[in-house]
Amino acid sequence: RGWIVALVAVVLVFALLALGMWSCTSAVSSSIGTLGALGSTATTSDVDYLTSDAVGVIDIDGTIQYDGTTCSPEGLKAQLDRAEQNPHIKAVVLRVNSGGGTATAGEEMAEYLREFSKPVVVSSASINASAAYMISSQADYIFTAKTTSIGAIGTVMQVTDLSGLMEKLGISVDNIASADSKDSSYGTRPLTEEERAYYQAMVDQINESFIETAA
């Protein structure tokens, strides 16, 4: 029953937000990566001493990548593990303000959220897109503002060709590789048709995984 009450409380908070009846200094505010109680704020150290039911707050603010913050798989998992292990944390609010990032990192984070046993509500800020949306799709509820940029399900890869610029600058590069396509992403020559097809197949495969995760 405890988690049901906590989830209802979270949903009510976001209903008030949607109606413009909750201030910017609402009870769910906290610093990046902290877990706080609904009706108060708490530091990460305070969480260990909670004595009543609470709602955890975790921020994903920035590029999804492997940097150790809550925008990374290892950082998010650490916070989710703390929330999972604390019996007083009945649900989690994931505050997302991210345009995406590394597909692999996003997929890992989505998996961690999918395995999390307690209710999760996503609060979207100005943007919740691409890899960030992949993560958010695993929550029980996603809330957005009318002006939130959300979704952007798709995959892109860039392979830069600097050979023309290097020629103008008089720069010559000799690539010594063990296979013909080993230097295809170095930017020192245009892609061959076979290499372009290889990278396109890779992008398509990643995108299929993205769609399956978000579905």
What would you call each of these model-derived segments?
Residues 1-119, 127-215:
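Small-residue-centered hinge/linker elements
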